[in-house]
């Protein structure tokens, strides 16, 4: 949070004011490691790593978390109060949710940011929040390139996937079933063993089937046609009884999610012994 206290030299305690590009700007220092080490009691996570506990959090992850929770390191003086208000409200909201045990933790994920340096500014990213396993709130930060027009859509919530039935097409993500499976004849709920997809798997599945949450207008028609063609092909193969379902596969540790966000990925298909079509999503070239 920002607090301005002017001294006799017209500087600020903890902040500095100087002129840049014809306008006065306010600068602040990044929080140091000691500050973040004392964060362990707050149950904050950055890219699935617990702040104050995990030693593998990188400097760039700390910087992104700092900017997200406490605002940019540089802001125009004319915008300062609005920035403070927006950032403080967000921080206090998350702090209240943790203190009142509304959630057990908050996991802020920057893997979908196309340009992490662009987060220096407050108004060029948006958020997608989902309540995941163990009552942890997942906050996906998505950077937005400025001065371009975009089509936007909402991510499907968990209720949408829970109602996915095999009468559409049996669907799996990383070999975990999606939605409710029914017998064709009696239409009676048929429970299948297996683990439920996690919030990240649902997120990637949504992007794979329905396209990016934001896409530039000039790219919208081309990307939409390609996505609809792929989905129609899977449904056709299923209705013709050539496959018994589709399994979307990706590696959580090696996948570049920013490329999936922009549908910049390749797919590799193979059919297993149960006639399940495995669709491997690849974002990095294999050596």
From Swiss-Prot:
Keywords: Plastid. Its main location: plastid. It is found in: Plastid. It comes from the Eukaryota. InterPro entries: DUF613 (IPR006851). It holds the Pfam family DUF613. The keyword Plastid applies. GO terms for cellular component: plastid. Belongs to the A.longa ORF167/ORF288 family. This is Uncharacterized 34.5 kDa protein in rps12-trnP intergenic region. It comes from Euglena longa.
